[in-house]
Amino acid sequence: MNKCVELVVGKNIRCLREKSGMTQDMLAAKLQLSGCDITRSAIAKIEVAQRHLYPDEIILIKEILDVSYDEIFDIQ
């Protein structure tokens, strides 16, 4: 992904995570339970575009936060 897109996607994930009442620790734990090898620190880096998102992580984040891909990739 392009850096500008990663910034927007990261902000969207943070906003959606906070809207669902979930902390970075909680999201990381749910991702880990779903088989994703990720830490709270990695979530923090994703939210500020310091780490790339992998397709399997995007799919799981979408499912855990119960949002659509459009909400995650909403670039306006």
Where are these regions (language model features)?
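Helix-turn-helix DNA-binding elements, focusing on the entry/boundary residues of the two helices
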Residues: 13, 24, 40, 55-58
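Recognition helix of helix-turn-helix/homeodomain-like DNA-binding domains
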Residues: 32-52
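Conserved hydrophobic/aromatic packing and binding residues within compact polymer-binding modules
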Residues: 13, 27-28, 43-46, 72
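A detector for short, charged/polar N-terminal pre-domain segments
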Residues: 1-8, 74-75
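DNA major-groove recognition helix of helix-turn-helix/homeodomain DNA-binding modules
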Residues: 50-71
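Short basic helix-loop element that most often maps to the first helix and adjoining turn
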Residues: 11-32
